[in-house]
Regions:
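Short, amphipathic, aromatic/basic-enriched membrane-interface segments that mark the entry/exit
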Residues: 1-10, 93-102, 147-153
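Helix-loop interface residues and adjacent transmembrane-helix termini in multi-pass membrane transporters
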Residues: 26-29, 82, 99, 195
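Alpha-helix N-cap/helix-initiation motif
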Residues: 8-12, 30-31, 65, 119-123, ...
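Transmembrane alpha-helix interface/packing and boundary motifs in multi-pass membrane proteins
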Residues: 23-31, 111-121, 163-174
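Juxtamembrane and boundary regions of transmembrane helices in multi-pass small-molecule transporters
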Residues: 122-126, 141-156, 160-228
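Short hydrophobic alpha-helical membrane-embedded segments
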Residues: 8-17, 102-108, 155-159
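Membrane-embedded alpha-helical segments and adjacent helix-loop junctions characteristic
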Residues: 34-147
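Hydrophobic transmembrane alpha-helices of multi-pass small-molecule transporters
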Residues: 1-69, 189-193, 200-228
Length: 228
């Protein structure tokens, strides 16, 4: 049987709009926001996504409280970067905990934990705030990427710790990673009796998350120790 007959006309139209939007997002003829708005407009103009109903299918995403939670978190995270507050927090933890290599790793972990609830991009959090601090600390210790011996001085340990800790903090809050709200919506679609709120997610992840943040740098220190 022809597979196309299993999809109605609106479904095929939506597929065409979706593919076109994805191609535009990849090739970037316009900024991401403009491409997204144009894609939505085309879907509404062609009536692929109607404006009738409550909420209207074309605008249903704007009625999702989780979406607005993520939007607010993006605004706050931009403030961390622009004002330099994120770096100030990182440096404060370094001054308090940075008496050893393990202390530096725990300081970076604490920074990630503080920033995670308001930074829905784990890449931006790690690469935009914490990585520059780790790089500076590594260079101060004479650790560069030129040789394996130099990397093992301090930089390799801190970078490995940064990556592993970032994975932990990304799972601790709904707003710590863009994929988490998708998981919440998927759970709702299954009609489960549990309503996963921001607080419930954070409470459920608190104990395993904090234990992991304490153990990961320590275990890495034992398995992949810096030479300084």
């Amino acid at each position: 049987e022809d597979g196309s007959k299993l999809v109605d006309a609106d479904g095929m139209h939506m597929l065409a709009i979706f593919v076109g939007t994805i191609v535009a997002l990849i090739t970037q003829p316009l900024p991401t926001a403009s491409v997204s708005i144009i894609g939505l407009a085309v879907a509404m103009i062609t009536k692929t996504m109607p404006l009738e109903g409550s909420p209207a299918p074309a605008l249903a995403g704007f009625a999702n409280s989780t979406v607005w939670l993520i939007v607010a978190a993006f605004f706050i995270s931009e403030g961390f970067v622009v004002t330099g507050l994120g770096k100030r927090i990182a440096l404060w933890f370094v001054t308090k905990l940075g008496r050893s290599s393990l202390g530096l790793a725990h300081g970076m972990a604490a920074t990630d934990l503080v920033l995670a609830p308001a930074t829905p991009s784990n890449t931006a959090r790690a690469g935009g705030v914490i990585f520059p601090i780790v790089k500076s600390l590594s260079l101060l210790a004479g650790s560069t990427t030129e040789t394996e011996e130099s990397r093992r001085t301090l930089g390799a340990y801190l970078m490995m710790s940064l990556v592993l800790v970032n994975t932990v903090t990304s799972a601790m809050f709904i707003t710590a990673m863009a994929g988490n709200p998708v998981a919440v919506d998927a759970a709702k679609a299954l009609n489960t009796p549990v309503d996963i709120s921001w607080g419930k997610w954070a409470l459920a992840a608190a104990v395993p998350g904090i234990v992991s943040l304490l153990l990961v740098p320590w275990l890495l220190f034992k398995l992949y120790p810096p030479t300084r």
